[in-house]
Amino acid sequence: MTIDRARELDAADPLAHYRDRFALPADTIYLDGNSLGCLPKDTPARIAEVVAEEWGRDLIGSWNTADWIVMPQRIGGKIAPLIGAAPHEVIVCDSVSVNLFKLIAAALQMQPDRKTVLSEPGNFPTDLYMIEGLEKQGLATRRLAERDRILEALDEDVALLLLTHTHYKTGEVFDMAELTRAAHDKGVLVLWDLSHSVGAMPVDLDGCEADFAVGCGYKYLNGGPGAPAFAYVAERHHSALSQPLTGWMGHAKPFEFLDDYAPAPGTDRLLCGTPPILALAALEVGVDLIAEIGVERLFAKSQALSEFFRECLSERGISLELVSPEDPDRRGSHLSFRHENAYALSKALIARGVVGDFRDPDILRLGFAPAYLRFE
């Protein structure tokens, strides 16, 4: 019986007890952690502490006494091992969209003889929109190549290759090492969007010699809706890094209030305005929890969950067209299915307490966030 098998898998699951660290509605099967992660139980208390004590009692002094001022660097350092980076290569700031803008512009400045930014059609819209925005300013030329034509599209005009590591709609994972190496062979820099990878699967930015990366904090890192994003810049690019959003917090000496901008060292120069302390506090709880579990263990469980789900469909005689790769090593932590009535299916599942999501025109996405899902 499938239910017996599910219970056996739960009993043998070394991560099962982590489910108790999250606030989960009793009547809901939540398969949308790839859109918004669940609430860690420690988060409300941490936010209350920041509000009542650090802000309410200690007021402005908490920028120093509670180390608010270094939260972007501290949390970035905690995200770093999750993505195969050194702590000083990662900073938490702004949103994915804003960080994309900064890093695309930075890459173009590093490649003054090249203007083209290459991506693929069907990439997450904000990635494409940020290139388009720079194109309308006369600073870039956008080029799109189908996934199987990317390598041949890398030529002497391309300054930057911008790709999403795990595709938001299909879950397909790019071979980061292969594509980065191929791009570098053509003198092209590479920017990876890790929004659907970070916290769900191992990533090795330094090992793959990536140049730049961005990622969000509200999916598998469970930082809450609108959680701050992060940016990665390989150490070898720190001295040449120049980005256009030169806010006061990215200044080398922000509290000297000088008239002229001088960039802070390394990734600190990616900071713009005052950090959102409450949001950072929530994100840090989620990051700490994912780091405690470990991305290798999380990915192994995610693969087991998704494969068991497919077995259940087969046993029940339910036929859905799988859009995600068959090989679990070639996909992230969500499965995507194509069905002409995908929207209606999504709504019917939600009505029964099974929360997935729909992507236009005909994709049903089901996320298997392993930190809090069980097999049963």
Region spans (language model):
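Pyridoxal 5′-phosphate
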Residues: 1-376
